[in-house]
A protein has these predicted regions:
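Charged, low-complexity intrinsically disordered segments
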Residues: 1-68, 73-105, 121-127, 180-695
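Eukaryotic intrinsically disordered and solvent-exposed regulatory patches
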Residues: 14, 59-62, 110, 140-143, ...
């Protein structure tokens, strides 16, 4: 939600706050506000796709600061969009605004666009640190306030609705939360902050009844109030003139309305006067609208999240709080949603059959980067919405629909199902309909029992969607399987097709991330490996300056945005399939400033292998990844007209069908699985001890 204009007014008036030394307490945190705030206020890259490794370190430092002051954090994340659609117009306007901001950033001007995988990185860091967190079914504001109300502890957020909720523990705006300035006094540490309480606020307006504040919020205008309602009231009411205080920002409408409300002893009398002023034949509907808005701020005595955090799981679900579309969903799915193991996309598709895709900084003249991951999203939608069990032979009847279509028998047993997608078209937000599709080879899957399906079957669904032959992953570490599969998918689903230098920079980025990940693990052979550290430092020096806004290569930015979209969708499909592949650490998958720097160096003539010179472990990893990708290319050419997972004996047929184009590509990209095997054998005996002997 959010009350229009209230944050700037309140934060500009120091007298509404008290200073607080935060320590030794529970703290309920608005997770979405936090990751936005941490990313945007720490100078991290927004133009080149984001620096997730640096962001993860910021998140770790934040929670380390809380821990040093004995503050116990409980993080609550937003879920899906409101099922009533009363906020959807606002969300569309924000999405349109972000399209223009992303375009502005791509041209070297100002804007704020959160990189696509930020939320996933944040969630994974919470898991790694053991920070308790939960995901709501829709907006988290009310659940956050309810939890803090029951626990009588403060809330940390950046949402002006918390100037309305009556919380005895108070509201701590992130603007004044100095987590990076921990103060030590004797044996105790504390974080300087400012606390807002409605009692103190109301005392500045003739000690007005604090129960009047919800009416104030609804009339002043929040995300759920129609603008015409606000305009109608303020065009008719006569507000008292308030003298402007020196040194404080002026907001005559807000101050005047608060003083006007302070004349009423209770909200009912004030509501009647408001309706009298607005009058007309719409009085009944206005009463209903305003009363519903006021109810949004009425907190219950207990919170369902308190039980969740006490027991690590919700034992039961209050169906009255669930959107209607979720009441019939399986319990395993609801548990994974509340635990954050499934994203808001799942909720939006189940409840509204809608997806609002996140804008990226890319070439606005080209189609959206999310077109590259369309087939992955179609499978996600199919698994969520096409729940009827299909008793049909998975390998028959694929005429007229191509590789991604449903078998004819499956089509006859299931009516078409569509999802509304909202995405960028040039500089406008466009609505399109996307048909949900069940996995071609396993159309009998049902969402109700998806978690009980054999992992081998779920893995085949994932590989089939990404068009990957499982055996070529045999030399790749399991936690890198998904990034490698996604990279293969990206290479063959993106337009324009990624260049060799782009593929190499993505793989070098994965190598860099893996080296950094292992260097941070005490006891790993790379933890104290000097040559590995040197290679990482050398690669770091190739980074683009995140503060440098101009001169971004939009072709590179667009292609890497396509990779991120494929990775984002691949992560979500893996989550929905209950992790048939290990989930990779997103913080180490992509660093935009590094990849842009690497691509420029590679395009300038440097060899990828030369950038890893002196670190055999790094070179072995790079060659293994490249060999796997080249294996995919080989298999893809061979199986262009054959279903995935078919026996290898038919490869020659497929190659003959492919013709001369396939031959040219085979000459250019030799190797395949056998090349990966040779490379693995060649470097298999090299360890960091070998490197140490040379130093």
């Amino acid at each position: 939600m959010g009350v229009h204009g209230l944050t700037s007014y309140v934060e500009g008036n120091r007298q509404f706050f008290t200073d607080l030394k935060l320590r030794n307490t529970h703290l309920v945190i608005d997770g979405c506000s936090l990751y936005f705030r941490l990313y945007f206020t720490t100078g991290l890259d927004q133009i080149r796709g984001g620096d997730y490794d640096a962001f993860a370190k910021v998140v770790q430092r934040f929670f380390a600061a809380l821990s040093s002051c004995d503050v116990s954090p409980f993080v609550v994340l937003d879920g899906g969009m409101d099922e009533t659609d009363k906020k959807f117009k606002t969300l569309q306007e924000r999405a349109q605004s972000k399209i223009h901001e992303a375009h502005s950033l791509s041209r070297g001007f100002h804007g704020s666009v959160l990189p696509l995988l930020t939320r996933e990185v944040f969630r994974q860091v919470l898991c790694e640190l053991g920070v308790p967190f939960a995901q709501c079914f829709s907006e988290a504001d009310f659940e956050i306030a309810s939890l803090a109300h029951q626990w009588r502890c403060p809330v940390l957020t950046n949402d002006s609705d918390f100037y309305i909720f009556d919380l005895c523990g108070g509201y701590l705006p992130m603007t004044f939360f100095e987590w990076d300035n921990v103060c030590s006094k004797a044996s105790e540490c504390y974080i300087p902050a400012r606390r807002f309480t409605v009692n103190r606020f109301c005392s500045h307006f003739n000690h007005m009844n604090k129960q009047l504040l919800p009416l104030f919020a609804v009339i002043t205008g929040n995300d759920y109030t129609h603008a015409k309602t606000t305009d109608m009231f303020f065009s008719r009411v006569e507000l008292p003139t308030v003298p402007r205080r020196r040194g404080s920002p002026s907001s005559p409408r807000i101050e005047g309305f608060l003083h006007w409300l302070s004349a009423f002893t209770n909200p009912l009398a004030a509501l009647e006067e408001v309706l009298e002023i607005m009058g007309g034949r719409q009085k009944s509907s206005l009463r209903k609208q305003l009363t519903a808005g006021i109810q949004d701020y009425q907190l219950p005595p207990t919170s369902s999240l308190a039980q969740f955090f006490s027991n690590s799981q919700l034992q039961t679900y209050n169906v009255l709080k669930l959107p209607a579309a979720l009441t019939s969903q399986p319990e395993w799915l609801l548990k994974r949603i509340t635990s954050g193991s499934l994203p808001p996309l799942v909720l939006n598709v189940l409840v509204l059959r809608r997806a609002l895709l996140i804008v990226q900084v890319e070439n606005s003249r080209l189609p959206s980067s999310h077109e590259a991951s369309l087939n992955i999203r179609k499978t996600i939608y199919g698994l969520l919405l096409l729940k009827n069990t299909m008793q049909c032979n998975a390998g028959r009847g694929q005429r007229g629909r191509g590789r991604g279509g449903l078998p004819e028998q499956a089509q006859s047993l299931s009516a078409p199902c569509f999802v509304e997608e909202y995405d960028r078209l040039e500089l406008n937000l466009r609505r399109t309909t996307v048909e949900a599709q069940l996995p071609t080879h396993h159309p009998q899957l049902s969402l109700n029992t998806l978690n009980q399906v054999a992992i081998s079957v779920r893995r085949k669904v994932l590989f089939g969607t990404l068009r990957v032959m499982e055996h070529v992953l045999q030399f790749v570490e399991p936690h890198l399987h998904l990034p490698v599969c996604v990279t293969h998918f990206w290479m063959h689903s993106s337009t324009p097709k990624p260049s060799q230098s782009l593929l190499q920079c993505v793989l070098l980025g994965l190598v860099y991330g893996e080296l950094c990940r292992r260097k941070a693990i005490f006891g790993d052979q790379l933890h104290a490996c000097a040559s590995t550290a040197t290679v990482c430092q050398n690669l770091d020096q190739l980074r683009m300056n995140s503060a440098q806004r101009r001169g971004v290569d939009l072709g590179v930015a667009h292609s890497l945005s396509q990779w991120q979209s494929c990775m984002w969708a691949g992560i979500y499909l893996n989550q929905l399939l209950c992790f048939p592949l290990p989930e990779p650490q997103s913080a180490w998958l992509f660093s935009g400033t590094l990849l842009h720097g690497l691509e420029a160096v590679l395009r300038g003539g440097h060899q990828a292998e030369s950038l890893l010179a002196g670190a055999p472990v790094a070179l072995q990893l790079y060659c293994t990844l490249l060999g796997a990708i080249q294996g995919f290319v080989f298999q893809n050419q061979a199986a262009q007209h054959i279903a995935p997972f078919q026996a290898a004996g038919t490869r020659g047929q497929g190659r003959r069908q492919r013709g001369t184009g396939g031959k040219r590509r085979h000459h250019r990209r030799r190797g395949g699985a056998s090349a990966a095997s040779d490379l693995s054998n060649r470097f298999g005996m090299l360890t960091c001890e070998d490197e140490s002997d040379e130093d």
